[in-house]
Amino acid sequence: MKQCENFSIPHTRRHWLHTAGCGFGAVAFHALSQQIAAAADPTLSTQTLHHTPKAKRVIFLFMHGGVSQVDSFDPKPMLKQYDGKDLPFKGLDTLDIALKDKLKENKRNGRVLDTTWNFQQHGESGAWISDLWPHLTKHADDLCFIKSMHTRGTSHGQAVAMIHTGNDNLLRPSLGSWVSYGLGTENENLPGFVSITPPAGHGGARNYGSAFLPAHHQATTLGHSGSKTADATIRFLKNPTVELSEQQRQLQMLQQLNRKHFTQNQHPQIDAVIRSYEMAFRMQNLAPDLIDISNESMATRELYGLDQEPTSDFAHRCLLARRFCEAGVRYLQVSTPYVWDQHGGLVKGHTKNALSVDQPISGLLTDLKQRGLLEDTLVVWGTEFGRTPVAQGTDGRDHNPAGFTVWLSGAGIKAGYSHGSTDDFGYYAQENKVHMHDLHATILHLLGIDHEKLTYRYAGRDFRLTDVYGEVVKQVLA
């Protein structure tokens, strides 16, 4: 006769942590309510604000792969003049050695490639936007373009790590984790950092991880890259093998064991674990409602392009970002799959990709503005690097970390403004250069945080997001 295994009731705290953790334990540990943690550690509370914030939260729209700036937001008439010709290039001596070598290689192996798309000025600000982004043009006067971005790393792994963690080769906390650590959450029932379909490659979890910061500051993830957002769930929030009522009874027993253990040891981490499970229980009631978009109006669904292709999936991500933002999550990371890396087939690839995200992003900006959320929400659109003005092969562009564009919108941002510039061919940042560290410093500044003062002691030194670099780009502030 087959023996009945695991029949005995688990009676140790460790055993309960294991069995109950299959349902909500993992979420509980890293989605700990920062308001509760602040009671034991004041560095996690809003008392760390160094000045009056303009933004309460951030939505970071990450275009994974490298969007071409000269085909999107940075028109260069010289590309047409020199199309198919060698690049008459000067100015490489101003760049660091790695970038200089990379650009010299591009110059030797490729000829100038003109853009396929037409650029026009839009809005009262006269912002230049190509017809690759027709829906975004409606928001020209709400956007602030930084056209002089540059970063470290010529490979995706390095550059993706830079945009998300501020370091291209070492394990460091992600930007969202630093925001969670510095500000906590506006809603004690939700984590401070949520990543919707996070990037899987080029560093994967490090791009939304907490590294040496307390583990509860890493992102709570919703789905994964390549999965349909409509099917996305928060992992470990519910144990599919037991009913919710049974799970609640497990939690009650676990809490009794934890409290007994706490009275014997009086360790603050045990108390934090107790409270984290309570927060996980609250998430069980709130998170499913946030993920369920069935109550959204038809007008909202049409605004985002939710019920049509090819916009449906990214529209779902942007709509979830608005819902989590509205509910009090501090930092939303919304990523595309790794689709923007057109070393060949640039026109086909960029057209397909822009069609899938242009309307949803436009819808998000409109929705935030209509609800009054854009006044205290910072929206960041970014990509790990740009692309070269010379061709790779016949119809592609190579990586270009020396000069590219990001844009900002919302809280505290000078709307309808373009900052900085690249050279005549869009190859490298030339005027009012902005490094990735500067962008990070500016984001923290808008949240009320001095990037030089937000530090964490680890391995004998004080670490910060911007390391020993970074300056706030004051020109882009309202």
Task: Locate each region found by the language model.
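Ligand-binding pockets and gating/stacking loops
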Residues: K2-A478
